[in-house]
C-alpha cells in the first residue's frame, strides 16, 4: 500500500521556493533517508508533509488523502515528527512530554487515562530511557531530549514517522539502539522518512535514498546507487577519496 505520495510539489516560501517539482512515493513498511547539505531543504520538505508549511504547488497525500483535506487531529494520527531540538518552556517531566504524543486520541479537556501512561512508558522502555520518566525536561542532556522526542512521536502510533536528524545528539550506543528501533518499526509496517547526515545510517536501514541538491533539485533511488562516493562528494562539496577515507565501509571502497 502506498503510504506517502508527493506529486510535483514545490515547497518553500512565497517568492522563495526551496525545492521544486518534487515527486516520489513511499509504501507501507519502507524507510527513506533524505541526504543533503545544511540548508538544502530537508526540514522544509518535512514541514510541508506535516501541513505546517503550505505548498507552493503540487500536492502531498497520506494514504491517498491530500493533507490539505485532513483535520489537524487526523493528520496527527497519521504522521508524527521528531524535530532536531526542543527546548521546552515549562517544567514538564519526561513522561508528561511523551504523553503529549497521545493528544490526538484524548479529548480536549480530558486527562490521559491509565492505558495512555502504559503506552508512553512502553516507548521510554523501548529506547532504554524509562529511568528518565520522572526527570524534569530542563535537566536533560541534548541526547536524552532527543530520545524522549522519539518516544513522544512513537506514542502517537503514527503510520508515517518523520525524523529530522534524530541521531545528531546521540552517543554511539544510542545510535545503535535507534537504528534497531527503526528496523523494528519498518517490520511492523510503519513508513519512515529520515533526514540524516550519516550515510552509514542510510545504508543500514534505508530502502530508498533521496538526494537533496543545493540547486533545489531532488533525485532518488536505492542506496546502492545513491550512496556511491562520487554522488556523496558532489552533495557535500568534498572529494570521493575523502568519502572513502572517512567512512571506511566496504560499500564505499573502489
Regions inferred by a protein language model and the residue ranges of each:
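Conserved catalytic motifs of ABC-family nucleotide-binding domains
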Residues: 157
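The feature captures the beta-strand-to-loop junction immediately N-terminal to the Walker
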Residues: 35-37
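Helix-to-loop junction immediately C-terminal to a conserved catalytic motif
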Residues: 50
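Conserved ABC ATPase signature
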Residues: 136-140, 144
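H-loop (His-switch) and adjacent beta-strand-loop-beta switch element
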Residues: 209-223
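Conserved ABC transporter NBD signature motif
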Residues: 58-66, 75
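Catalytic Walker B motif of ABC-type/P-loop ATPase nucleotide-binding domains
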Residues: 161-165
Amino acid at each position: 500500500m502506498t503510504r506517502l505520495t508527493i506529486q510535483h510539489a514545490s515547497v518553500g516560501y512565497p517568492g522563495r521556493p526551496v525545492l521544486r517539482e518534487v515527486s516520489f512515493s513511499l509504501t507501507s513498511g519502507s524507510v527513506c533517508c533524505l541526504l543533503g547539505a545544511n540548508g538544502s531543504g530537508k526540514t522544509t520538505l518535512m514541514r510541508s508533509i506535516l501541513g505546517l508549511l503550505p505548498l507552493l504547488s503540487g500536492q502531498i497525500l497520506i494514504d491517498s488523502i491530500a493533507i490539505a483535506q485532513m483535520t489537524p487531529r487526523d493528520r496527527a494520527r497519521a504522521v508524527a515528527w521528531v524535530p532536531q531540538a526542543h527546548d521546552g518552556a515549562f517544567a514538564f517531566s519526561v513522561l508528561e512530554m511523551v504523553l503529549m504524543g497521545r493528544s490526538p486520541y484524548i479529548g480536549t479537556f480530558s486527562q490521559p487515562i491509565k492505558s495512555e501512561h502504559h503506552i508512553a512508558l512502553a516507548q521510554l522502555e523501548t529506547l532504554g530511557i524509562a529511568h528518565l520518566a520522572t526527570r524534569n525536561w530542563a535537566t536533560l542532556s541534548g541526547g536524552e531530549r532527543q530520545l524522549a522526542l522519539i518516544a513522544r512521536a512513537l506514542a502517537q502510533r503514527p503510520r508515517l514517522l518523520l525524523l529530522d536528524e534524530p541521531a545528531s545528539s546521540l552517543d554511539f550506543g544510542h545510535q545503535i539502539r535507534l537504528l534497531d528501533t527503526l528496523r523494528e518499526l519498518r517490520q511492523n509496517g510503519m513508513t519512515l522518512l529520515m533526514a540524516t547526515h550519516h550515510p552509514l545510517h542510510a545504508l543500514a536501514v534505508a530502502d530508498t535514498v533521496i538526494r537533496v541538491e543545493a540547486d533545489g533539485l531532488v533525485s532518488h533511488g536505492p542506496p546502492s546507487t545513491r550512496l556511491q562516493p562520487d554522488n556523496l562528494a558532489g552533495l557535500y562539496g568534498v572529494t570521493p577519496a575523502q568519502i572513502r577515507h572517512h567512512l571506511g565501509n566496504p560499500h564505499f571502497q573502489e
